[in-house]
Curated annotation (Swiss-Prot):
Biological classification of the source: Bacteria, Pseudomonadati, Pseudomonadota, Alphaproteobacteria, Hyphomicrobiales
Organism from which the protein derives: Brucella abortus (strain 2308)
MF (Gene Ontology): carbohydrate derivative binding; glucose-6-phosphate isomerase activity; monosaccharide binding
Cytoplasm listed as a keyword: yes
Gene: pgi
Signal peptide: none
NCBIfam families from the UniProt entry: PRK00179.1 (NF001211)
Protein name: Glucose-6-phosphate isomerase
UniProt cross-references to SUPFAM superfamilies, sorted A to Z: SIS domain
Isomerase as UniProt keyword: yes
Family according to the record: Belongs to the GPI family.
Catalytic function, reaction form: alpha-D-glucose 6-phosphate = beta-D-fructose 6-phosphate
GO CC, alphabetical: cytosol
Chief localization: cytoplasm
Length: 549
């Protein structure tokens, strides 16, 4: 069926009425009166558990949310994506990051062309190159083994590889991986400073080989290599992820060190492609293929499971409920796993660049809020930074906890148990809170004077009823990481379909690039600032004055 705008609007109205009148208000009571609540509001895919029972939903909520997904034609849009249709309508492109990890199908067609042989060819070339670097068969210009790789990219060419490489640290042997993204010269200076050009490989990740931040840093790195080893050494110390073969050749990188990808792969969905080359070098081709396999398992589940048993669909529906119906403008991603410390930033781009839109697929203003602000830090660090606001602040911010049942350090299992206890305790505390009577009783148990009890007790009250969901997997390994990232990719897709927006363009990013290009000659003093707004003129003048001081 097609998207039914009338039915969708009516279901949204029913959801808003339900939220105002009959959604759970007291989560303690919801659990105490309903022993089956956890069982009904949780799902598993193998070892991966998704629990949303602490969110303020009941059976009526879930029935209406399923009705919403049907009216929005989530299933039809999903089928169109997997079929290679051009669902990115503003750029007239297919959206097929799922093909990058598909090892089971015989064909996936884009405009009549089977892309799977192309994907396999690039993946096999990546594996051969990664094995060559890791084994020492591919050496630097002086004959030394490569000990360090530096990936230069930005946005999707950086956030995914950084996140995945850090997450899979237990699977590293060598070489060491470093990442440069910011145009700020301090970033590349600090990265290159302790390294030796003779044992360093630099990967330049830019599809067009024109991204200003990436190419500026690449030229700096090229000079660093050439000044020490000579111009002839450049080719042995660089590789590129790009489709602009002429520009790559002009830079000095041989064609056999260039790895391409396709316009049906968006930047923030590209870690599965050649953009993942630094990840593959760091953890090895076998582990990278397990990473792809985990994502593919989630793809198959998302494609085939019925709506009410589908993890990405249910995660997306809860996300929509929190954003559009409950009115929560933010969501916090809290992985209780230090190696997932860059996951919140990765999901921030995935979600906010995808669903930070204000017009519908047909170019009309949206009728309600779209993507939330996404942010977070790993636990337990976040508990000592911003959890105060999450517990007692005036805004309700849903949390998404992620934790593994087992850590990678068997001799430190007691610390992992403490980590898990903190995760579950925060989830419970946000839901249950603490009443004024409980706060009084706690203080009275310390034999404090009655006047002090009455003065302090209100400060120790927690409203509770603050929603959170929890994802638990066995262990953070390549397969589990791939599955987790694919879960969030498809969740973004589901929310976008209900919002009625295009999750696969990013025109807001392009605007900033255009203005930065225009302002560079002004900031460098080659052009005047006249014609700019008064604020920009004043800022430029101040910068010029301080640079001369």
């Amino acid at each position: 069926m097609a998207r039914d705008a009338t039915k969708l609007e009516a279901t949204v109205a029913k959801l808003k009425k339900h939220w105002a009148e009959s959604a759970p208000r007291d989560m303690r009571a919801a659990f105490s009166t309903d022993p089956g609540r956890f069982g009904r509001y949780s799902l598993c895919l193998d070892d991966l558990l998704f629990d949303w029972s602490k969110c303020r939903v009941n059976d009526e909520t879930m029935a209406l949310l399923k009705e919403l997904a049907v009216a929005a034609d989530v299933e039809g849009r999903r089928a169109a994506m997997f079929a290679g249709e051009h669902i990115n309508n503003t750029e007239d492109r297919a959206v097929l990051h799922v093909a990058l990890r598909d090892t089971s199908s015989k064909e996936v067609l884009v405009d009549g062309h089977n892309v799977l042989p192309d994907v396999k060819h690039v993946l096999d070339r990546m594996a051969a190159f990664a094995d060559g670097i890791r084994s020492g068969a591919l050496k630097g210009a002086t004959g030394r083994k490569i000990t360090d790789i530096v990936n230069i990219g930005i946005g999707g060419s950086d956030l995914g590889p950084v996140m995945a490489t850090l997450a899979l640290a237990p699977y590293h042997d060598e070489p060491r991986a470093h990442f440069v993204s910011n145009i700020d010269g301090a970033h590349i200076a600090d990265t290159l400073s302790p390294l030796d050009p003779a044992s360093t490989l630099i990967i330049v990740a830019s599809k067009t080989f024109t991204t200003i931040e990436t190419m500026t840093n690449a030229q700096t790195a090229r000079k660093w290599v050439a000044d020490t080893l000579g111009e002839a050494a450049v080719g042995a110390h660089f590789a590129a992820v790009s489709t602009a073969l002429d520009k790559v050749a002009a830079f000095g990188i041989p064609e056999d060190r260039v790895f391409g990808f396709w316009d049906w792969v968006g930047g923030r969905y590209s870690v599965w492609s050649a953009i993942g080359l630094p990840v593959m070098i760091a953890v090895g081709p076998d582990n990278f293929r397990k990473f792809l396999a985990g994502a593919h398992a989630m793809d198959v589940h998302f494609r085939d499971a019925p709506l009410e048993k589908n993890l990405p669909v249910m995660l997306g529906l809860i996300g929509y409920w929190h954003r559009a119906i409950c009115g929560y403008g933010s969501r916090a991603i809290i992985p209780y796993d230090q190696r997932l410390s860059r996951l919140p930033a990765y999901l921030q781009q995935l979600d906010m660049e995808s669903n930070g839109k204000s017009v519908t697929l047909d170019g009309k203003p949206v009728s309600g809020p779209t993507g939330p602000v996404v942010w977070g830090e790993p636990g337990t660090n976040g508990q000592h930074a911003f959890f105060q606001l999450l517990h007692q602040g005036t805004d309700t911010i849903p949390l998404e906890f992620i934790v593994a049942a087992k850590g990678h350090e068997p001799t430190l299992d007691h610390q992992h148990e403490m980590l898990m206890a903190n995760c579950l305790a925060q989830s419970e505390a946000l839901m249950k809170g603490r009443t004024l009577d409980e706060a009084r009783a706690q203080l009275q148990a310390k034999n404090l004077p009655a006047s002090q009890v009455e003065r302090i007790a209100p400060h120790r009250v927690f409203s509770g009823n603050r929603p959170s969901l929890t994802l638990i997997h066995d262990m953070l390994d390549p397969y589990a990481l791939g599955r987790l990232i694919a879960l969030y990719e498809h969740r973004v897709f589901v929310e976008a379909q209900i919002f009625g927006i295009n999750a696969f363009d990013q025109w807001g990013v392009e605007l900033g690039k255009e203005l930065a290009t225009e302002l560079l000659p002004v900031v460098s003093g080659k052009e005047g600032a006249s014609g700019r707004d008064a604020s920009t003129q004043g800022l430029v003048a101040h910068l010029h004055a301080r640079r001369k001081a």
